[in-house]
């Protein structure tokens, strides 16, 4: 870490250690919220580069080991954010009068390598096949060899042709040929048992997803030689699995009595991809500086500015969600068990990857996904936000972040971003050194007054 930033990061670590002593992964309550700060001069509400840099450097540091979904490192990030919310005088909206919200997760884990039988041929996970995702088990069906451009009917066992685009959304089991990418991770994936993804416990159980299996080259050739309609069975012995993820949630009550009952949610996901096992000479930590420490810091910066200056007209809930990278579990729980009634939420604004300017747009510009779906983007832009419509609607960014959880429940919900297609995305290269702090600070600052006036 550069020496000039060491002092600020050490100070943040001290703040975290103090908060961690008061808050546990089991959701113990922190102490009482700080008193409401007195109104300050206008310049105290500015978003400073020093603020943005210091918080992002900590959240994306090696000390948090990539903030892996549902890990102790994710909990540390949530606890750290909670300590800041407390300091700024936000109202706690988490468990037991605190700011941290624990979300218990439940799933299933295979206890032995799953097996696939097609006709008289048997294949085993880790040998002739690799089970990538685990759906319903046991499962039975008949082989259907898809042609290029074809689509599998509901419940089908679909064999995907090499290099062809096909529809597999309704298939129960998908059989694909191994790829170079799969071959590179074959040994690592074979060494652990497949699992059904953890999901928030207590919510309506989802329909089991597809089982996706990659067949090694000889096995794929053997299955391809079989006739359509050949009987298929898939077996896996499953045991319950459990885990947890953590949100950090605080509230700032609006200043206008006529509008304070309406709630604006400002959100981001605090988790990332964690770390791979250590390897000599290799960077194995996915720091997630842009994805999504940048969005998390944007929410923190807005919380700080709005809490220290004039209150916003409407009540604002600041929500940092866990396990977005593992399926959006923190947001799913929040929407299912909201801290304020859903029908009082006028909009959710998710912040995702604000750390680099978009080469297609002017500097310091942000864009809003699904711009045409509501008047929110136009309203914010008219009030001074550096905000335009998503220039790449073909990428379907509207459905690719936690805002979609709100949208599916009828809440106006969008994501604000600045660029998400850079080469460091979801790699260990997503480091603080690549963040454009001047761009990020100016872009966030342009949102303070528009949000305050909403």
What are these regions (language model features)?
Residues 121-149, 192-288, 301-304, 308, ...:
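Soluble metallo-hydrolase cores and metallopeptidase-like ectodomains found primarily
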Residues 121-124, 212, 220, 311, ...:
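Metal-dependent peptidase/peptidase-like ectodomains
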Residues 16-18:
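C-terminal motif of bacterial Sec signal peptides marking the signal peptidase cleavage site
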Residues 65-163:
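Noncatalytic luminal/extracellular "stalk/propeptide" segments of secretory-pathway proteins
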Residues 44-93, 109, 115-117, 246-319, ...:
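Catalytic-core environment of secreted peptidases
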Residues 20-22:
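Bacterial signal peptide processing site
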Residues 36-41, 46-72, 88, 92-97, ...:
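N-terminal capping segment at the start of a domain
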């Amino acid at each position: 870490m550069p020496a000039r930033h060491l002092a600020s990061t050490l100070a943040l670590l001290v703040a975290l250690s103090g908060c961690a002593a008061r808050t546990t992964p089991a959701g113990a309550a922190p102490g009482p919220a700080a008193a409401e700060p007195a109104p300050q001069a206008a310049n105290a509400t500015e978003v400073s580069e020093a603020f943005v840099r210091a918080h992002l450097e900590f959240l994306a540091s090696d000390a948090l080991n990539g903030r892996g979904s549902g890990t102790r490192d994710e909990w540390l990030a949530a606890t750290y954010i909670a300590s800041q919310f407390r300091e700024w005088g936000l109202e706690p909206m988490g468990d037991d009068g605190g700011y941290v919200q624990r979300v218990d997760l439940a799933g299933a884990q295979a206890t032995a390598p799953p097996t696939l039988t097609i006709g008289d041929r048997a294949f085993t996970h880790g040998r002739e096949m690799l089970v990538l995702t685990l759906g319903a088990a046991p499962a039975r069906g008949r082989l259907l060899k898809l042609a290029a451009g074809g689509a599998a009917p509901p419940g089908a066992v679909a064999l995907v042709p090499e290099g062809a685009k096909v529809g597999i959304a309704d298939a129960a089991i998908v059989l694909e040929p191994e790829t170079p990418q799969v071959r590179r991770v074959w040994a690592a994936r074979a060494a652990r048992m497949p699992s059904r993804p953890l999901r928030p416990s207590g919510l309506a159980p989802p329909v089991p997803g597809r089982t996706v299996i990659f067949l090694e080259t000889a096995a794929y050739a053997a299955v391809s030689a079989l006739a359509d309609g050949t009987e298929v069975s898939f077996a896996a012995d499953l045991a319950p699995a459990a885990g947890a993820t953590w949100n950090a949630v605080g509230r700032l009550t609006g200043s206008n009595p006529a509008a304070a009952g309406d709630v604006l949610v400002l959100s981001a996901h605090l988790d990332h991809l964690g770390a791979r096992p250590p390897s000599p000479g290799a960077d194995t930590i996915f720091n997630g500086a842009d994805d999504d420490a940048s969005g998390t810091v944007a929410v923190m910066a807005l919380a700080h500015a709005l809490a220290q200056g004039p209150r916003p007209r409407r009540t604002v809930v600041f929500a940092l969600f866990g396990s977005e990278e593992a399926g959006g579990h923190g947001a799913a729980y929040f929407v299912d068990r909201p801290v304020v009634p859903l029908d009082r939420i006028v909009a959710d604004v998710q912040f995702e990857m604000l750390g680099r300017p978009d080469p297609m747009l002017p500097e310091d510009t942000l864009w809003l996904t699904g711009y045409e779906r509501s008047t929110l983007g136009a309203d914010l832009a008219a009030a001074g936000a550096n905000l335009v419509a998503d220039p790449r609607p073909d990428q379907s960014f509207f459905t690719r972040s936690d805002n979609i959880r709100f949208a599916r429940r009828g809440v106006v919900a969008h994501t604000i971003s600045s660029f998400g297609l850079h080469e460091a995305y979801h790699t260990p290269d997503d480091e603080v050194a690549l963040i454009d702090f001047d761009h990020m600070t100016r872009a966030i600052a342009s949102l303070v007054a528009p949000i305050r006036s909403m």
